[in-house]
Amino acid sequence: MCIRDRFVYDHPFQWGSKRTGPDLARIGGKYSDSWHYIHLLDPQIVAPGSIMPPYPWIFDHPIQISTTPAKIRAMQTLGVPYPEGFDENANVELKKQADEIVKNLLKDKIEIGSDKEIIALIAYLQRMGKDGRLSKK
């Protein structure tokens, strides 16, 4: 993967800004969905000594999908390379990804609805560093 591909969805552009926290640029696929679930629930379980706080509220809050099309269109105006018409089927893709993550979590006896923020965050983390569309041109 080309370096520029890692930052294709960073808007505003992040290079040169101060970063605090771990480098998530290539975390996608490095850990299982269950690992991310547990890490966000209680980081010390999977990373002893971690100073990361837990994020318990994302396990209860549902994601808000009603604004997804508008958010996609806004990102397109900023130059994010979503394909034409993606705003209209983004929630369908979101649901497919969410259902796949829930299925993976069930393999480890973790039960949660596909509409929770934790599922969206796991989907996001699993994509980090895996989008190589620019390199394929």
What residue spans do the PLM features occupy?
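C-terminal capping alpha-helices of c-type cytochrome domains
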Residues: 31-137
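Short, small-residue-biased leader/transition segments that mark boundaries at the very start
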Residues: 1-3
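Surface-exposed acidic, glycine/proline-enriched linker/cap segments
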Residues: 5-16, 99
